[in-house]
């Protein structure tokens, strides 16, 4: 296997909170997949949940080398946890097509948060 890309992002949680206060659910709708949306709606810490998802998706877009453009959208990157609780990525739509085109066979996700920040790193491999 070879590393195709590496992306890291850090999000100030208060910034996400301010956006939600200003525009309601609009950011969550733009960022979250349908499955993530269902979790977010009942999550005991929805702002922190959204900040962490946003960080992973930004990191993934950086790892793919594209950013969020040319048909890619945040909600095409879905963060879920495997049976051990490890964060993983599932791709949809244009993100999945890009991964197939690049020959991506594995994606590694690490996610951390503290009081004020959420941070994520994504590595994609061929």
UniProtKB/Swiss-Prot annotation:
Transfers the 4'-phosphopantetheine moiety from coenzyme A to a Ser of acyl-carrier-protein. This is Holo-[acyl-carrier-protein] synthase. Belongs to the P-Pant transferase superfamily. AcpS family. The keyword Lipid biosynthesis applies. Transmembrane segments: none annotated. It is found in: Cytoplasm. GO terms for molecular function: holo-[acyl-carrier-protein] synthase activity; magnesium ion binding. GO terms for biological process: fatty acid biosynthetic process. Its EC number is 2.7.8.7. Its cofactor is Mg(2+). It catalyses: apo-[ACP] + CoA = holo-[ACP] + adenosine 3',5'-bisphosphate + H(+). Keywords: Cytoplasm, Fatty acid biosynthesis, Fatty acid metabolism, Lipid biosynthesis, Lipid metabolism, Magnesium, Metal-binding, Transferase. One of its GO terms (cellular component) is cytoplasm. Mg(2+) binds at residues 9, 58.
């Amino acid at each position: 296997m070879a590393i195709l890309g590496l992306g890291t992002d850090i999000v100030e949680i208060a910034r996400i909170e301010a956006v939600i206060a200003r525009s309601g659910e609009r950011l969550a709708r733009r960022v979250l997949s349908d499955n993530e949306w269902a979790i977010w709606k009942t999550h005991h810490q929805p702002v922190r949940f959204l900040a962490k998802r946003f960080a992973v998706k930004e990191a993934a877009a950086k790892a793919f080398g594209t950013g969020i453009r040319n048909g890619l959208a945040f909600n095409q990157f879905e963060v879920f946890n495997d049976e051990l609780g490890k964060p993983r990525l599932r791709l949809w739509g244009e993100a999945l097509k890009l991964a197939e085109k690049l020959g991506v066979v594995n994606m590694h996700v690490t996610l951390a948060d503290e009081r004020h920040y959420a941070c994520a790193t994504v590595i994609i491999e061929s």
